[in-house]
């Protein structure tokens, strides 16, 4: 007789939601002992990872720092290293999470894709943190023109409200890698990441935000090429 044991943990194949993995009892390899090292190494952290690897790690970091998950800390992190030795920063930020994997990877229209994605994420941010933010912030934000202006407005309003932002950008290089695969786009790519291109302006605005309410950044992707351009020009 074939019997499936109900005691064995399941492998979280294809799963990236840390809360689901932990609360539903999936197998999880504890790597949270590295969190204190990351916190002490740099407030603005850039992480290059192999493709399709460590996706859930970014997710658990988002969950760890989110002020909204404070009451769930023991359920999510109990038994893990960080649950036994929590850091001072846990559950103390408004988390702004951007994932560039869905942005259209064509240089002639990537700005519209970036604006649309950020608009959705900024609106969601205003909704879930409404109790921490000034009334009417979402309506004022929506009146701004594009991701650069909206980000500028958002981090200034958070500063006025006395709130700190932890900015996560996942797959920051996704649409840029698609652009670089097209030889005809290389010249325009250089234009966008040098001088006053829109992508450069966006990362410049993040840098400006680090003097305001953006207290920490965690940027991850699979290629250093885009970050090499913006870092080498003093953007981050």
Predicted segments with their positions:
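Phosphate-binding site recognition
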Residues: 1-236
């Amino acid at each position: 007789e074939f019997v499936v044991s109900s005691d064995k943990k399941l492998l979280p194949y294809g799963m990236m939601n840390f809360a689901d993995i932990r609360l539903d009892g999936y197998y999880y390899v504890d790597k949270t002992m590295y969190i204190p090292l990351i916190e002490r190494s740099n407030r603005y952290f850039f992480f290059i990872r192999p493709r399709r690897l460590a996706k859930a790690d970014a997710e658990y970091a988002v969950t760890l720092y989110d002020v909204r998950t404070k009451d769930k800390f023991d359920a999510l992190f109990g038994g893990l290293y960080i649950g036994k030795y929590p850091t001072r920063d846990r559950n103390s930020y408004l988390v702004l999470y951007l994932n560039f994997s869905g942005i259209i990877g064509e240089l002639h229209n990537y700005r519209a894709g970036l604006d649309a994605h950020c608009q959705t994420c900024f609106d969601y941010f205003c909704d879930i943190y409404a109790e921490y933010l000034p009334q009417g912030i979402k309506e004022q934000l929506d009146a701004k023109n594009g991701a650069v202006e909206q980000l500028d407005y958002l981090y200034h309003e958070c500063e006025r409200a006395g709130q700190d932002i932890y900015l996560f950008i996942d797959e920051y290089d996704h649409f840029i890698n698609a652009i670089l695969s097209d030889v005809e786009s290389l010249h325009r790519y250089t234009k966008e990441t040098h001088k006053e291109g829109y992508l450069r302006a966006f990362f410049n605005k993040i840098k400006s935000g680090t003097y305001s309410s953006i207290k920490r950044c965690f940027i991850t992707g699979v290629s250093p090429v885009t970050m090499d351009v913006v870092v080498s020009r003093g953007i981050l």
